[in-house]
Amino acid sequence: MKKNEEGACFIFHMRQDYVTIINAMAVMAMNLDVMKRVNRAVRVVSGSAKGRPLKSVPGMSTRPTTDKVKEAIFSMIGPYFDGGTVLDLFAGTGGLGIEALSRGMDRAVFIDVEQRSIETIKDNLKAVRLQEAAEVYRNDAARALKVLEKRGAAFDLVFLDPPYKFKNGDELMNDMAERKLLREGAVIVLEYESGYEYPESFGHFHGMRTARYGETAVTIYRYETVQGQAAGADEEESHDDNRE
């Protein structure tokens, strides 16, 4: 009887250990899947630095643009460039500006108010060997535009990817226009919360296309001071892709 009890106890513990091992393996698989998805979301998609991994900002809940959304954006505005200067405002990891450099832009200016973001952008630029083509500054958006105006800067492409609580993207674009920071025909990529609506056109900005990816919306504007230059406006797409 005692031997039977010992045998049953042994089998019970064996089963418990087996269940524990299976659960541990499942957790490891889930963690590995998460790591793979994160890694896919922070790489250069195309161009000279294609496939190079980009660091995320440590300890911050930034929303780096996923590869699918990034590829969709550049398909709408490029996908490649024959020179030009790009401004990555609210730069975060610098992923969008770095992608533009990788795809042919000559110069990039990165602006962010967080020191950790600035350090991450510099690290990412070094990792993809594009630091010589970039300038990185810590400042808030409004002050940064004043500084850029004094320097006589002008841009062909602008990325505006502010926190979702920021609802004044159109005002910021008008400020850039008044400060003559935009070249004729400049393209502005505005990312914002999908539930929010920006005007299709305003001032000298003409909406070329709007696409929605889960919680994120992207509107492409073109800056034109000459009437009749903006074509292909009023297009809108919806997708199920989400940002991180």
Model-predicted regions and their roles:
Residues 2-4:
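Polybasic, lysine-rich low-complexity intrinsically disordered segments
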Residues 7-244:
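Class I S-adenosyl-L-methionine-dependent methyltransferase catalytic core
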